[in-house]
Amino acid sequence: MNIKMILLDLDGTLLRSDGSISDRTKQVLKSCQNRGIYVVIATARYWIGAERYIEEIQPDYEITTDGTLIHRHGEQIYSCSLDVETTNRIIQDLLTKNPETEITVATGRQVFWNSLHISESKKLHKAVYNDYSEPLSCHANKIVAELADYETAEQIAVRNHCRLQSYRGENWYAFLPEGAGKVQAIRELAKILEISLDDIAAFGDDINDMEMLEMCGTGVAVANAVPEVQAIADSITLSNDENGVAVWLAKNVLME
């Protein structure tokens, strides 16, 4: 096994249930980097929602915002976005369906949000308030809103020719540029670094990690992953609360 890059989903995979990363996991990741292996986070979170963990583990690259952005130490090197017209049309469609719906719009590392409780949010306390009463002048990498059902979200996605992403057990839906996602971002990064997909180990737990695990040479599911992810994984490690990522890397990459 010649692993040259490690791809890490955050929530439910690298992070424990309390949102922390164990010292053992941080130690193992640093040992991998010391051997010349790229450590990359690949998360649906916005950059500002992942910033705390970026500072903690100092990955070589950050794939965030459902694969629409790649940063290297905070510097953007790749972006896939909706045009300004589509961005504003989606926002208006969402507000037409429900004038009270909460909407977040990511543009690069900045996030707009029409919530009055931004300061109370653990993930998005650095978001900028916007009530969307005036059109935005930016390209959105990702728009997320809470909607009553999937059918409503699908109608908006079809009308605006964008990709729809849903999340396990939640009524939040993401609207992404057509063709965007973790898989496309990984392909772009592998091309930049001239690394074969066969030499990448990817770790995940949820439905939106499946393509990533299937595409890479080694797909690893944590024990708490949904059944669909475990079914397609090449290997299953311990759960996120049992240092599953670190245990697998120590055994199969560091040979400890």
Where are these regions (language model features)?
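Active-site phosphate-binding/coordination module
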Residues: 17-119
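Conserved acidic, metal-coordinating active-site core of Asp-based
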Residues: 93, 97-212, 224
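Short, structured coil segments at secondary-structure junctions
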Residues: 57-58, 66, 159-162, 215-216, ...
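Short hydrophobic/aromatic-enriched beta-strand-loop microsegments
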Residues: 59-67, 80, 123, 165-167, ...
